[in-house]
Curated annotation (Swiss-Prot):
The protein's role, per its UniProt record: RNaseP catalyzes the removal of the 5'-leader sequence from pre-tRNA to produce the mature 5'-terminus. It can also cleave other RNA substrates such as 4.5S RNA. The protein component plays an auxiliary but essential role in vivo by binding to the 5'-leader sequence and broadening the substrate specificity of the ribozyme.
Species annotation: Macrococcus caseolyticus (strain JCSC5402)
Keyword annotations of the record: Endonuclease, Hydrolase, Nuclease, RNA-binding, tRNA processing
Domain of life: Bacteria
PROSITE patterns according to UniProt: RIBONUCLEASE_P
Sequence similarity: Belongs to the RnpA family.
Phylogenetic placement of the source organism: Bacteria, Bacillati, Bacillota, Bacilli, Bacillales
Subunit field text: Consists of a catalytic RNA component (M1 or rnpB) and a protein subunit.
Top-level class of the enzyme under EC nomenclature: hydrolase
A GO BP entry: tRNA 5'-leader removal
UniProt-recorded name of the protein: Ribonuclease P protein component
């Protein structure tokens, strides 16, 4: 995923936490904030140290990025922050993808219906 698609600055994270809407399931929390300035979506990922060691956290982050890259054309041009919860550490990449699709449908983060 290219740098233009990433949210890195703390002030951007804080703005989205404060003004964005949140949706959650057992594995993930997604904050979504409208951003008409961008021509594509932006993604921030947060995986706490409580979830596991660096290898585990990076595996989860890679799976989240892969899921968003897979649906790049279908995602609304907003800012998203994905926070991983404890149950996500036992999940496979495919299960993470399905769980994120579920939460994004609830958050109405897709342009069209995803099957």
């Amino acid at each position: 995923m290219e740098k233009a698609y990433r949210i890195k600055k703390n002030e951007d994270f804080q703005k989205i936490y404060k003004n964005g809407k949140s949706v959650a399931n057992r594995q993930f929390i997604i904050y979504r904030q409208k951003n008409s300035e961008n021509e594509h979506f932006r993604l921030g990922i947060s995986v706490s140290k409580k979830i596991g060691n660096a290898v585990t956290r990076n595996r989860i982050k890679r799976a989240i990025r892969e899921s968003f890259t897979k649906h790049k054309e279908d995602i609304i041009k907003d800012d998203f922050i994905v926070i991983a919860r404890q149950p996500s550490k036992e999940m496979t990449t495919n299960e993470i993808n399905k769980s994120l699709e579920h939460v994004m449908k609830i958050a109405k983060g897709f342009n069209k219906r995803i099957t």
